[in-house]
Amino acid sequence: MASSKYWIHNYRIADHIFPKEDQIYVQCWHGTPLKRLGYDIETFDNALNTINELRFKYKVDAKKFKYFLSPSKFASEKFISAWNLRAFGKENAIIEQGYPRNDKLFNCTVNDINRIKSTLGIEDTDKKIILYAPTWRDNQHDSSIGYTYKTEVDFDYLRDAVGDKCIILFRAHYLVASKFDFEKYKGFVYDVSKYDEINDLYLASDALLTDYSSVFFDYANLKKPMIFYMYDFDAYKNEIRDFYIDVEELPGPVITDRNQEELVRELKAIENNGAY
């Protein structure tokens, strides 16, 4: 970092690290936000930071970057407000040119997808492939390991109900330090949390199961079905982050409790007709 001309980053750089005057830091962020960020958060249950401490971190980051890559007008508006860029006179730092990483979603071939499935060990399946990619929770943290996550899916129930029709690729958020043991569900649940390229998982899957993650914006480019399993919706909306979008506007069915029967119904609907 000390000798490079450009810094390309998709998260906030540590508060104590600053670019030199002749270095250019390009903030690419890591997705279009559904959940509120930075200065836009008004309710905040976080294990490590107060709301003022978080806003300070965004303020420090705003002082560092010269450019901020945005995929859309919607995202630009949210980035400007979340980093309070107008107050710092930096709203013109936004470059609204889309995410280069999404080009792969449009340029892939059947051979590319077959190669990905082979790498994942699912090349011979004729079942629907469901990518389950939940986000992390600000208020779930263990000081000994970091952020934790407890899956609120009854995989026993799902396997009995749709195991003959579907397999699940489970991708935990990179901040989550929890270890997951899916040995009991071998052949039904595949832990792909350590697989580096999430775009490959988008391409290999037939549908997305997520909650508040920004992955759905990128996945929408593929026009594949999506299910939003927001089992802790009330707490997330009222205590943790809240949202930029009314969930009724999301491009797929929304489940706002732990209703496994409803989740199974939506998975079966995908298996039967692939409705989007």
Predicted regions and their residues:
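Helix N-cap/beta->alpha junction signal
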Residues: 11, 71-74, 174, 212
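A donor-sugar binding/catalytic signature common to diverse glycosyltransferases
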Residues: 7-36, 195-240
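Short, conserved loop/helix-junction motifs that constitute active-site signature segments
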Residues: 16-22, 59-64, 87-89, 161-163, ...
